[in-house]
């Protein structure tokens, strides 16, 4: 590549200053694709998660899984294994209409000779104008680890949604809620180490008992633990195989009943 540029421009040396233009080569079987990386840091990194737990789910996968459920901002959402807060934060960002790339930088922002900085500024300004953090939502995140709960709060603050989520230290067997028709969307422990695997049956039993006490709720669980249904105590209506990075996981769907439709108020005739 350097030789070709030397021939084209008729010069022997290029100064190594200014903006970087990373070149990526992608190989798929016998086909190679060469491109310039305009993003820099991988797009699955939103820019808010500086601290994460043991087996974090990527921001993009969390958002995709939420969109696979019927949840919307008018419904309660609880994550009893919230870790660094990815599910609650992504849900709150959706509800507040916060664009996923607002809290990060892109490699091409420094390419003044190719992309005008005004285009990025205009895009960020437009995205900012559409944000609505005044929206009322009931989103809660719980975890047994007080330090990771603290990290989740800090991540939510960086994402601009700390006022929309309630985080608290709480074990899964204390999970309860007085209201009906809520959602649990969660990424519980998988048991990556042998000693952790021994604890999984009891943990998933506790989760199943907690689910049984939630009246009319829907539960969605992503896990690599293949005995999840057995110990949760019920069969999923649907089970999707999904890769979290290189790890094969399962997205178990336990949909609950739909809430009754609200009756429209009829105005009396004058």
Language-model regions, residue ranges each:
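Beta-sheet entry/capping signal
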Residues: 22, 31-33, 74-77, 138, ...
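Conserved S-adenosyl-L-methionine
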Residues: 57-177, 192-193, 198-199
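C-terminal catalytic and target-recognition region of SAM-dependent MTase-like enzymes
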Residues: 168-270
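Short acidic, glycine/serine/threonine-rich loops at helix termini
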Residues: 37-38, 46, 92-93, 232-234
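A short acidic Gly-Thr/Ser loop motif
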Residues: 28, 81-85, 244-247
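Generic solvent-exposed, charged/amphipathic alpha-helical segments
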Residues: 2-6, 153, 208
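Non-catalytic, mostly N-terminal accessory regions of nucleic-acid modification and defense proteins
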Residues: 1-59, 66, 267-270
